[in-house]
Every structure is written in C-alpha cells, then in structure tokens.
C-alpha cells in the first residue's frame, strides 16, 4: 500500500481537516462512527481507501491523521463533533495555552512541550503503514501555531523521515483581509522554513476563496465552512488517484517530479472547476473543455495572484468522473493555443494529466452542485512571486520600526532570524524572476534551431 499520513496543525489546519475527512467518509461510504455498511464491505477488493484509512479488527476505519493545536478549544470541537467516534482519541492532541499569533511561541516555547507527543503518535501511524508514501500537512502561515509549530513539525519530520515527500497546504494571509497584525512576520518566518523542509506547498488564501464562493455560488457572506468544503474538494481531487482507480493515476511523489523544476520553486497555485450551485448546474452543460478553461481562469485561482502576470512552468490537471483521455488531449491542445496562457519556453510540454473515474461527491445540503465531472489544477507559475512580494512589503514596513519584535525576542528568538528569513524570501523573489527571464535570453539562440525545421 502507498499510505499517506495527514497532519492538521492549528485552527485553520484542523477546520480544513474536518471538511476533508467529512468528504472522504462520504466518498468511501464510511459512517461517522468508522463503520462501513455491509453492502459496501462486499466490494472488499476495492481497498484503495486504505491509503488514508486503517482498518481495525472490529471493522472500524480510522483515518491516518493527527490533529494538533496548542490550545484545546478547536480540538475539543472535534472531540465532541459528529465525527468524534471516527478518530482515535490519541490522534487529537491539544496543549494548554495557545501560541497567541506568535511564531516564536509556536516554534520554541509552547511548541516544544507538545512536539514529542505528536512525533510519537506519527511514529505509531507510520509503523502501521506498509509503504508510507509521505505526509500531507495542513496549516496557516499567518497564525502562531500553524506557522511556528507547523515549521517545527516539518523540521522534525525532515530529520525522522528524510526521504518521504511532504506536501503542504498553506492558508496564506489575504491582501485585504487580515486576521492578525503580525501576520507578515509569521508568514515570512514560516516561509523561510517551508522553503527548506517541504517538497510542494500549495497556497490557499481566504480572500480568493471568498470571492469564488460569492461569485460562483451566490453566497453573500461565506462562512469558513463554505470555504473549507471548497478546499476539501481540491484536496479530494488531488488524492482521489490514491484512493480510487483510474486511467491515469497520479502518485504523491509524481506531483513533485512534474511540478518542481528547481527545489526552491515549489509554491503552487491551485484552482478547481466547476464551482457551481445546484440551481445553475441544472442549466449548464459542463464539458471537459469548459471545465479546463475555467480552471485556467485567473478569477478561479485559490490564491490572490494573477497568472497572466507570469509564466507557467508546469501544471498538473486532475480530472475525475466521466472523462476520457481523448477529451483531455483536445482540451489541453486548446489551452496551448491561447495567448493569455504563457509557458516558459524551456518547458514546452508543461502538462501532467490524471484521470480518475470516481465522480466528485458533494456534502448533502452543501453549496456545491453534484456534477458528472470536475477538474483540479495545480500549477507552478512565476506569478506566485506577487504573493511573496506583497508580504515582504508589509514585513518591511513593520520591521523598519522593529514593531512587535520584542514579543518574539521575549520567547527566545533572535533578531537575526528575522533578517535571515527576509533575505531568504528576497532571494526567492529573485529566483522566480530569473526562472521567468532565463527563457528570454535563450530565445535568441533558439531561433536558429527553429529555422531548420
């Protein structure tokens, strides 16, 4: 088996986790108490869901995941929620006092009290796997726990499981909507760590997803539940090929191979289509080429960043439902002819496609319509540098006055770590710039070849 362990850190990570496991259970016909009704059990040959669930002797299916927060309230909601019987009680780990939006508290003082318990639990989960493929980590980079403790966790995982892939789903601070004053500090400090210790980071940002909910689902005031269910669909599409069979299945390590041209350039944009409400879906024919086009729409990107301002290096299209390779090839060919979608010229093919025959499942009573086919796109574009430069500007404004820095230093950080992290991000912006430019300089040389064709 190719198991995957999910780690949900901090409030954002746990709430996204709730939405994900709710969806996974629906997709596999697992009840909130972990039982699989007998009619489903007869499909015993279809045990691909064991990548995400482990089965106990009593026929109960337990998610291979850990929920961690430095304060108890959010984890307590899981402990008392609908799915309380699904999770092993030791997988729900909470500390006593929170990180107070402070990276240093999450990373140094409060974090180190909880980290060993977590790693011990992860070790047990890993021992329970026959062929552990890697980790999915869910956290926000703006808070204290997701950023500080999340990075501590990644650093320790790198030591213990060096060769395993780590995919990160990061809730990134939005340009306009802020939940904490010190977000820029936490984000810059944690990105410094994400650069080194994770293989692929998929950027999500609340504001972008709010806009998608408002525009496509006509929800006037989206709640976190609306947002998280949409994020869960993306994560479900990415992992569908691990949990079901399909024509072109994609492994977790394949994301890395196909999307990351250079180790540091591993921050991805994601989009999902079709995001439609039931009233609209009834009147629309959502063909493969239509959903592919809308996955490339800048407005459908789940992070506030416009891919038209950059070039694509690679992208991965994960289709599910009623889709055949012929349609996919046609849709991709159409995308390649569009002038607005530019690829760097050192990566001429640029597309990795996966097809999975399991149609998307929706949460009953949720906002999304039940559709026959859907696509999730993960793309590596130089435009993501916009997200970093926005954050760096905010960081610089505060750091120039050393505002709020004493809270971090008081928790055992050194001021040098701030400037080190900031320099690392400046280097990252430069890297993205060079990856985009490299091609222009090469263009002169290429013209000679083209003439020979």
From Swiss-Prot:
Binding-site list for GTP: 11, 71, 144-145, 179, 206, 228
Annotated site residues (Involved in polymerization) in this chain: 453
First-tier enzyme category under EC: hydrolase
Record PROSITE patterns: TUBULIN (PS00227)
Modification type N6-acetyllysine: residues: 40
Subcellular locations according to the entry: Cytoplasm, Cytoskeleton
Sequence positions that bind Mg(2+): 71
Full protein name: Tubulin alpha chain
